[in-house]
Amino acid sequence: MNLCFDFDGPIIDVSDRYYRAYLESLKGSSINKTQILTKEEFWKLKQNRVTDFEISLFSGLGVNDSKSSAEARKTLSFKAEFLEQDKLFDDVYKTFEYLKSKKITFFIVTLRVQKQLNHAIKQFKLDKYLDDDSFFCINDGHKVINDIQEKHILLVSAMNKFDLTPQDTWIIGDTETDIHSGRLAKYGKVIGISRGIRSKEQLEILKPDYLVNNLAEVISISSGVAN
């Protein structure tokens, strides 16, 4: 069995970064501070696929300002100073150490561009567990048009590079992109994880093979199947 991890959501907690970008996008507006969403309110909306435009409306902005705020967040969310807000989930190192001890092949496939990924690898010292060949991402400067298609290409590239069989590989992701692209690439199992940018309820609609809350549950399920 081989394991493929999406990055943001399963491995990286991006909620602080997205919330900081939300707050930044409201600066200069004349809205009442009491209308600004708490992080919990904001993240619940994000997880349930409420658009950035709608979130701005809920925060008291008018239509035009909401459009500007939503557009600004597309850039703000990926600026270096905001990427610093990212956190590694507590169970990641322990999970990677376990997989290495069991000699289980695992790798990361993400729609981050190379520069953003390199920043995170250095920030969280992930090169202790994975070499450069185990990260698959988007080239700097490349504009992603179709998330599912782009991720599918990366998933197939990983199979080819490692000479792995898709049916023996499981993908762990937190979005519809991960689930649909995993199925398109004919990965053996598709696991939805509910701590990322989609809620448990949203993931249930997609009918993944398994739905988990954390990586410990992934290990438990995979160990049970392997045995």
Tell me what each language-model feature is:
Residues 87-91, 112, 174, 195-198, ...:
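Short beta->alpha linker loops
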Residues 1-90:
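N-terminal helical cap/lid subdomain that shapes the substrate entry/recognition surface
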Residues 114-169, 180, 184, 202:
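Substrate-recognition "cap/lid" segment bordering the active-site pocket of phosphatases
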Residues 170-210:
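Acidic, Mg2+-coordinating phosphoryl-transfer loop and its flanking beta/alpha structural elements
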Residues 10, 17, 114, 177, ...:
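Conserved Rossmann-like nucleotide-cofactor binding loop
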Residues 80-108, 114-118, 152:
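Short, acidic loop-to-helix structural element flanking the phosphoryl-transfer center
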Residues 63, 104, 208:
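Short phosphate-binding/catalytic loops that engage adenosine nucleotides
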Residues 136-137, 210-214:
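Short acidic-hydrophobic, aromatic-tinged amphipathic segments that line or gate anion-handling sites
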